[in-house]
């Protein structure tokens, strides 16, 4: 049995869970999420917790057991606390600006790159420059991608990072806050 799949999911008081066949809907103070689970698993609500069980011990059921439990647990956490992906933008003149549901990124191109933010996702930008780890002279800006759907938050963060990935010589670009970069040595020149 899956070690992750057999753990019960606690349901906080503010959260309402509706199970309709293979569809699980979770409603909480931050919003509402729904997920269609694979037919190999079944979700059962007992008192103030959810249990994800397999229908049988077939290989597909074993493979999807832990995944299904994690998806439901992330939905419960998302509607109560939400998810945040912390990021940094480093480089001279590199900026972020949020207007409505559009994010304009100025990252060394001749034009700002605009990204449409999906519904339920927001970007919070800290306008104060902070020193960057592993660098003596560089400063950057911290920002965070916030939402209730963990997958959507990760997708938008990856989309933003892809605008200007880190370059290994000066360390400029957009990075996750937890990402580390080993700078490469540049050319040594003629002697």
Swiss-Prot record:
It comes from the Bacteria. Keywords: Ribonucleoprotein, Ribosomal protein, RNA-binding, rRNA-binding. The keyword Signal does not apply. Pfam families: Ribosomal_L6. InterPro entries: Ribosomal_uL6-like, Ribosomal_uL6-like_a/b-dom_sf, Ribosomal_uL6_a/b-dom, Ribosomal_uL6_bac-type. One of its GO terms (cellular component) is cytosolic large ribosomal subunit. SUPFAM superfamilies: Ribosomal protein L6. GO terms for molecular function: rRNA binding; structural constituent of ribosome. Coiled coil: none annotated. The keyword rRNA processing does not apply. One of its GO terms (biological process) is cytoplasmic translation. Belongs to the universal ribosomal protein uL6 family. Part of the 50S ribosomal subunit. This protein binds to the 23S rRNA, and is important in its secondary structure. It is located near the subunit interface in the base of the L7/L12 stalk, and near the tRNA binding site of the peptidyltransferase center. This is Large ribosomal subunit protein uL6.
């Amino acid at each position: 049995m899956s070690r992750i799949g057999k753990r019960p999911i606690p349901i906080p008081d503010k959260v309402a869970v509706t199970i309709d066949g293979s569809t699980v809907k979770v409603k909480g103070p931050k919003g509402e999420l729904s997920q269609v689970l694979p037919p190999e698993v079944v979700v059962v609500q007992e008192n103030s917790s959810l249990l994800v069980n397999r229908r049988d011990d077939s290989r597909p059921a074993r493979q999807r057991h832990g995944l299904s439990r994690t998806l439901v647990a992330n939905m419960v956490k998302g509607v109560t606390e939400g998810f945040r992906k912390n990021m940094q933008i480093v480089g001279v003149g590199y900026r972020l600006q949020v207007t409505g549901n559009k994010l304009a990124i100025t990252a060394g191109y001749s034009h700002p790159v605009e990204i449409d933010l999906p519904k339920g996702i927001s970007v919070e930008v800290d306008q104060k420059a902070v020193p960057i780890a592993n660098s003596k002279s560089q400063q950057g800006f911290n920002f965070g991608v916030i939402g209730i759907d963990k997958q959507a938050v990760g997708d938008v963060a990856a989309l933003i990072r892809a605008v200007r990935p880190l370059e290994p010589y000066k360390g400029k670009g957009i990075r996750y806050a937890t990402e580390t970069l080993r700078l490469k040595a540049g050319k040594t020149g003629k002697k």
